């Protein structure tokens, strides 16, 4: 699924049921999708594109319809270990799936470490500026939700749209890759004051030159 609220809710549902979830790009080629399915033997594939043959698959709308038939009370907790697996092309070019051998959620100690590394704190206004199938945006998004942050999810990662959202919603926390940082400062009529609400800014996903850091 793309970055939509259903994706977030589904991840929590999978963890609540003790499952491991594998976020995949909504643009993944059919061949790679089948390789992933063969590797992990999924109990369920949720996709709004084509459904892989031989595997139980639902669209997000079908999932919502089925969910309405279930009672509202929460099921008992089941520890989800591993909680997450990421896909990688590896050196061979063949799709590989790498499990994250840890439980879903964060301990108090884990959040303290996260605060020290990321600068995040509780109840911030946060913008998700990367796809959930990538490790860093995924970690930032869910750790933010664990901290009670309000998470704003843009429909695209266009530089102008990102600046507009930061200004409109007075975003306090955002993580970006250097390529997006570069696109933003090169925008025509870019006004640094549009970003004045930002209190914490993190970058990852590539080398960030000293010159680009100084400009920011």
Outline where the language-model segments fall.
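ATP-dependent adenylate-forming carboxylate-activation enzymes
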Residues: 1, 22-35, 149-169, 180
